[in-house]
A protein has these predicted regions:
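Catalytic cores of processing enzymes, dominated by hydrolases/peptidases
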Residues: 95-141, 205
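Soluble non-cytosolic domains of exported or imported proteins
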Residues: 24-32, 58-62, 97-100, 150-158, ...
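Long, well-ordered alpha-helical scaffolding segments within enzyme catalytic domains
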Residues: 32-43, 98-114, 148-177
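A short, glycine/acidic-enriched catalytic loop
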Residues: 14-25, 82-109
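Active-site-adjacent mobile loop/cap segments within catalytic or ligand-binding domains
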Residues: 6-9, 14-17, 69-71, 75-82, ...
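Active-site histidine-acidic residue metal-binding/catalytic motifs
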Residues: 1-63, 71
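Acidic, low-complexity intrinsically disordered segments
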Residues: 173-197
Length: 221
């Protein structure tokens, strides 16, 4: 029977700005990263569910955890990027032996970054309230321009594949590397989706500004 993985990319109520080479946000590039992870997991035979992108903030956290618990997922995987000036990758989990063993598998495969650490947390909603083990990644620091450039120029794909390797080992599945053509297609698809998300955000901003302009014009008449 296929193992079940629930995916939860960043879903902040107000997306966090980044120093990425193109206009981006934490929610945007974490979803692009999770597109790659999701596709690869399905290729390898996992059952996958993913948090609804239309929901953000506490509503997203609560609905995702409830959905994963009701589905009886085998593992809950979160992907965020960090801020505050560091330069490392981090996997967080509940402070118990089983969770730490799984987080250390992430540590084993996290080779594309200079530094990675495992940290226990008891205060994060998704770690605290999931019925299954939760692995909560802070992939890199999005307030570091150099690391942002790396992530958007091949680093995203490397991190995603290392995550897939770790999840295969944790859940006892056979890992198979993607062929080169598929990897390039994944990379291009992720970039297209990121640009589409940016375009949607710009359209919303334009609509808001247009409404304000029309309101101001009406007041002058």
């Amino acid at each position: 029977m296929a193992k079940k993985i629930y995916l939860s990319p960043a879903a902040h109520g107000t997306d966090n700005p980044t120093k990425c080479p193109t206009k981006c946000g934490e929610n945007v590039h974490c979803n692009a990263y999770m597109d790659i992870v999701e596709k690869r997991l399905k290729e390898l035979g996992f059952e996958v569910k993913r948090g609804d992108k239309s929901k953000t903030g506490n509503t997203a956290l609560q609905s995702r955890v409830a959905e994963a618990n009701n589905w009886k997922a085998d593992l809950y995987y979160v992907a965020h990027t960090n801020a505050s000036g560091g330069r490392y990758s981090m996997t967080m989990c509940w402070n118990d032996k089983a969770s730490l063993e799984k987080a250390n598998v992430f540590h084993k495969y996290r080779k594309c970054v200079a530094s990675h650490k495992v940290v226990t947390r008891a205060d994060l909603y998704e770690i605290k309230h999931t019925a299954m083990p939760c692995m909560y990644d802070e992939l890199f620091f999005h307030d570091n321009a150099e690391d942002c450039k790396w992530f958007h120029n091949g680093g995203m794909e490397k991190l995603a594949e290392e995550t897939v390797q770790a999840l295969c080992e944790i859940l006892g599945a056979t890992y198979k590397a993607p062929n080169t053509t598929d990897s390039k297609v994944n990379e291009l698809e992720a970039k297209v989706k990121a640009l589409q998300s940016e375009n949607d955000s710009l359209k919303k901003t334009i609509n808001v500004l247009t409404a304000k302009i029309n309101s101001a014009k009406a007041a002058l008449q």
